[in-house]
């Protein structure tokens, strides 16, 4: 499902020169497997996840997600993943339901199926009480639940979460 081989990322800094954010990381994740990246702050975990989601391009190595190369087939990768960044924004003027519904429409989910998925996700994540709440009125944990919901609305085969429990009571 995910194959990473010698994946690297460097950034150029005018003062410090080249900064290596990720250095030759390799791993494989099979379908159905839960896999976590562990390491101290600055180890490159978020950089790695952003490359897998095609937000950043690697400077070395190879990565495939659901059989698609992150460098040469980024659109195919994006349609097969749900990616939740650690700093995903929530629209202040939309309700929780509207935000998740909007993302479902971006993925062209048929209307009846979209409504069924919304009902199921809002019930499963215990979000019915914030269904009509504006983003501007939500707590950090509520916003995190909305981010999770919009990440999974299109039922992607691969989920990539960056700090998904931040702000949640777990």
Regions found by a protein language model. Give the residues of each.
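Catalytic Walker B motif of ABC-type/P-loop ATPase nucleotide-binding domains
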Residues: 159-162
């Amino acid at each position: 499902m995910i194959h990473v081989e010698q994946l690297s990322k460097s950034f150029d800094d005018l003062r410090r020169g080249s900064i290596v954010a990720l250095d030759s990381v390799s791993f494989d994740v099979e379908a159905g497997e839960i896999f976590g990246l562990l390491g101290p702050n600055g180890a490159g975990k978020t950089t790695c996840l952003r490359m897998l989601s095609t937000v950043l391009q690697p400077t070395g190595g190879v990565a495939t997600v659901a059989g698609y190369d992150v460098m040469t087939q980024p659109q195919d990768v994006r349609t097969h993943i749900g990616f939740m960044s650690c700093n995903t924004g929530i629209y202040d003027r939309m309700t929780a339901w509207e935000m998740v519904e909007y993302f479902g429409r971006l993925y062209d989910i048929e209307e009846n199926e979209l409504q069924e998925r919304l009902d199921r996700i809002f019930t499963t994540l215990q979000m019915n009480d914030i269904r009509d709440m504006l983003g501007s009125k939500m707590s950090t944990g509520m916003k995190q639940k909305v981010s999770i919901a919009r990440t999974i609305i299109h039922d992607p085969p691969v989920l990539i979460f960056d700090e998904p429990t931040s702000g949640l009571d777990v």
